[in-house]
């Protein structure tokens, strides 16, 4: 993983020492289960726990000879625990240890992500309420549409992230399965009771039908969920990038004292953090494809998934954690320019109220086509002049026959577009 995007506590979860500690935790859970079932002598687990040490360099040195990391680990621990080594890794295959340990890591990573995502939700909710009644222009196709509330825009982000909390909870549940079922998953050399007890100690459930491995659809679901969360963050980042354009300048991401925007142009304040989030979201999607490829392994298992997972598990979880933490800081500290929002609403000289005029003319008895033609005719004049849309309407003979000056002016009241904002917030809170 690129150190630039690695943050504690997530990065600490994926160190070599942490990996071997999880392996040892799985092995000890198995010996404890054997003990409790009376299948090995009492005291074995405690002695192994006291004598086994995580020696990364020793394991790597042995692996140079064995070319097998789990064998190197078993031999390394075996050299430390004397006679008890005959009960260590008893009846197991490498994937019993690897897959179960990976589940422990992914569950723990998921919990870290979940906690940070909930904090992000809290920030989004606070910002949404702060700007609940702040008018801003809504844009469709990048073009001014109708006024809306900036708080409502942020509420949409919050709503999506709340759904992502639920998705992530489901993804954690999806990978909360281990397997202690032997070489092809049929418990030939390790009884199911050992698996049940060992996994219960670890807080995991037995994979209902395993092969030599836990089926990889679980991991694909998990990584796909992480990519969906990242895409939601990207949506927020892209919106902020658009709103920070010089011509728009309604929102700006945080810009620290002493920060530089360009090596050549001192005036620049670029949305580099949101651009970074956009790029990292692309990487998150890239992790999904190989995880889907991992589902179709040969027969009861091949090892093609292993090299993929050494990359994607640590990288995807660390990348998303960085994205969530960074996005939280951006939204918490972004500058919201309410005056610029008002100025931008006025930029099109009242054209954003065209639908209200259309509906008023229909209300007065015109067909939709007749009303549309009148409104569009005056709107197109406005596009190409400095006059306000209302002025053209007040001069239009067809309009004057149907609508009074007071009625027309009332149609340009911006509060009309915010009248149901409180209802939307209240409805959302009830869900």
From Swiss-Prot:
Cellular-component GO terms for this entry: cytosol
Pathways per UniProt: Purine metabolism; AMP biosynthesis via de novo pathway; AMP from IMP: step 2/2; Purine metabolism; IMP biosynthesis via de novo pathway; 5-amino-1-(5-phospho-D-ribosyl)imidazole-4-carboxamide from 5-amino-1-(5-phospho-D-ribosyl)imidazole-4-carboxylate: step 2/2
EC numbers on record: 4.3.2.2
Reactions catalysed, as given in the entry: N(6)-(1,2-dicarboxyethyl)-AMP = fumarate + AMP; (2S)-2-[5-amino-1-(5-phospho-beta-D-ribosyl)imidazole-4-carboxamido]succinate = 5-amino-1-(5-phospho-beta-D-ribosyl)imidazole-4-carboxamide + fumarate
Keyword Oxidoreductase found: no
Gene Ontology molecular-function annotations: (S)-2-(5-amino-1-(5-phospho-D-ribosyl)imidazole-4-carboxamido) succinate lyase (fumarate-forming) activity; N6-(1,2-dicarboxyethyl)AMP AMP-lyase (fumarate-forming) activity
Annotated GO biological process: 'de novo' AMP biosynthetic process; 'de novo' IMP biosynthetic process
Alphabetic keyword roster: Lyase, Purine biosynthesis
SMART domains: ADSL_C
Presence of keyword Mitochondrion: no
Residues reported to bind N(6)-(1,2-dicarboxyethyl)-AMP: 4-5, 67-69, 93-94, 212, 263, 268-270, 307-311
Residues at the catalytic site: 141 (proton donor/acceptor), 262 (proton donor/acceptor)
Gene3D superfamilies: Fumarase/aspartase (C-terminal domain) (1.10.40.30), Fumarase/aspartase (Central domain) (1.20.200.10), Fumarase/aspartase (N-terminal domain) (1.10.275.10)
Pfam families cross-referenced by the UniProt entry: ADSL_C (PF10397), Lyase_1 (PF00206)
Top-level taxon in the UniProt lineage: Bacteria
CDD domains: Adenylsuccinate_lyase_1
Protein's job: Catalyzes two reactions in de novo purine nucleotide biosynthesis. Catalyzes the breakdown of 5-aminoimidazole- (N-succinylocarboxamide) ribotide (SAICAR or 2-[5-amino-1-(5-phospho-beta-D-ribosyl)imidazole-4-carboxamido]succinate) to 5-aminoimidazole-4-carboxamide ribotide (AICAR or 5-amino-1-(5-phospho-beta-D-ribosyl)imidazole-4-carboxamide) and fumarate, and of adenylosuccinate (ADS or N(6)-(1,2-dicarboxyethyl)-AMP) to adenosine monophosphate (AMP) and fumarate.
Family membership noted in the UniProt record: Belongs to the lyase 1 family. Adenylosuccinate lyase subfamily.
Description of how the protein assembles with itself and partners: Homotetramer. Residues from neighboring subunits contribute catalytic and substrate-binding residues to each active site.
Protein name: Adenylosuccinate lyase
Organism the protein comes from: Thermotoga maritima (strain ATCC 43589 / DSM 3109 / JCM 10099 / NBRC 100826 / MSB8)
Lineage: Bacteria, Thermotogati, Thermotogota, Thermotogae, Thermotogales
